[in-house]
Amino acid sequence: ISFVSMEGAQKNLEHDIPDWDFNKVSVCTRKMWNDALSKIKIEGNESDKTTFYTALYHTMIDPRCFSDIDGKYIGADNKVYQTSTFTYRTIFSGWDVFRSQFPLQTIINPDLVNDEINSLIQIAEKSGKGYYPRWEFLYAYSGCMVGNPAVSVLTDAYQKGIQNYPVDKSIQYAINTVRTFGNNEDGYDPGDLSKTLEYAYSDWCVGTLLRSQNR
């Protein structure tokens, strides 16, 4: 599979399944998942373990890889780009995951979090919007749910030392995001109370980022 080209799909296939051996692919896949899931070890009966590791597996499905093995990906302006510094990812269901899945990933899979922040920065930049998507799908701004969850993900990662991305640019896009969707000078949203609460939290996140840089 490639979102870029047939040639990209061929390269991905040759990299992922060079031998075209079903049994070998099965063994390798099982090992990869066992390695990923073994980052957390628990004690308990088999039923409890099945429930826990099934849930842990679910946290590792998205955001999924959107770039080819050679680093090429389709940007938010529908042009092809290439990177060697991160894996471009998609399906950021921000409001669903910023309180739970992403704080967990900062502990067990910080590289994934770093990938996602780089991807969000690229979307804000290549789209020309200059702010983060709330719920991203195939580099599109769906606008689903409320608040500014990407700002929270960025703040949590930055405070934990996950910073392998253009920090100044990431913070500027965070500022733009809360200015575009936020309480701003009024200090509240005239709509639902839940919006005021979410926006107040993202304002605090931006303030935390700026204080971390003595700004």
Give the ranges of each region predicted by the language model.
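Glycine-rich, histidine-containing beta strand-loop boundary motifs that form or position
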Residues: 1, 70, 104, 116-117
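Active-site cavity-forming subdomains of large catalytic enzyme subunits
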Residues: 112-120, 124-215
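Solvent-exposed, acidic/flexible segments
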Residues: 22, 26, 30, 45-49, ...
